[in-house]
Amino acid sequence: MSGLSRPLLLAVGCLAALCVITAAGNTTLAPNVTTASSPPPTTTTVPVSPTTLSPLPVTTPAPDICGSRNSCVSCVDGNATCFWIECKGKSYCSDNSTAGDCKVVNTTGFCSVPTTTPTPTNSTAKTTTLPSTTTTSTTATTSGTTNTTLSPTIQPTRKSTFDAASFIGGIVLVLGVQAVIFFLYKFCKSKERNYHTL
């Protein structure tokens, strides 16, 4: 082999190895996200008196479904329009949130010791931001869609596979560059041989 072909052969081998390593390391997995189609949630700002610890949202009257509930958890957990009212030792579930000096509860976090086990329902989604004692307004976010459980789908782990197209493309690229270098070298050497000094 001539002096120039050995480095070129070494360069081809190195570039081929580099192509194989690059193709083997180029595996990316795209996350599979499942989203539920629902209307955007509505945000309502409701004034809160500074003496109460729970928000007093404005509600629309509902049929008498709140009166049949007998515990704080079952009252506020299953329905967005029901409120648990604790007033002077008497507690009851109502759809009217305006009670005089009574404590109005609309989240299970403010319920005192529950008397019965909550019955899970799937009627409406309800998210409420709890106010601090220094704020005078709170933001309640509710949407009219049903609760859905989204479980992410897990893609099986993909083993690194050899990408033949990338490998062949890399070889063609390297051989093309080497051919250009080879012909430039031959061209320069032929010009050098033609002009010998005497």
Curated annotation (Swiss-Prot):
Regions of compositional bias (Low complexity) in chain numbering: 33-54
Disordered: annotated segments: 32-54, 117-152
Residue ranges crossing the lipid bilayer per the database entry: 164-184
Region ranges (Required for endosomal and lysosomal localization): 192-198
Principal localisation: membrane
Extracellular side: 25-163
Topology in membrane: Single-pass type I membrane protein
Keywords: Cell adhesion, Cell membrane, Endosome, Glycoprotein, Lysosome, Membrane, Myogenesis, Signal, Transmembrane, Transmembrane helix
Modification after translation (UniProt): Highly N- and O-glycosylated; contains sialic acid.
One cellular-component annotation, GO: endosome membrane
Regions of this protein lying in the Cytoplasmic compartment: 185-198
Residues spanning the signal sequence: 1-24
GO biological process, one term: muscle organ development
Positions bearing carbohydrate: 26, 32, 79, 96, 106, 122, 147
Subcellular location: Lysosome membrane; Endosome membrane; Cell membrane
Subunit organization: Interacts with CXCR4.
PANTHER family associated with the record: MUCIN/PORIMIN, SIALOMUCIN CORE PROTEIN 24
Physiological role: Sialomucin that may play a key role in hematopoiesis. May be involved in cell adhesion. Promotes myogenesis by enhancing CXCR4-dependent cell motility. Positively regulates myoblast migration and promotes myoblast fusion into myotubes.
Similarity comment text for this entry: Belongs to the CD164 family.
UniProt name for this protein: Sialomucin core protein 24
Organism: Bos taurus (Bovine)
Gene name of the record: CD164
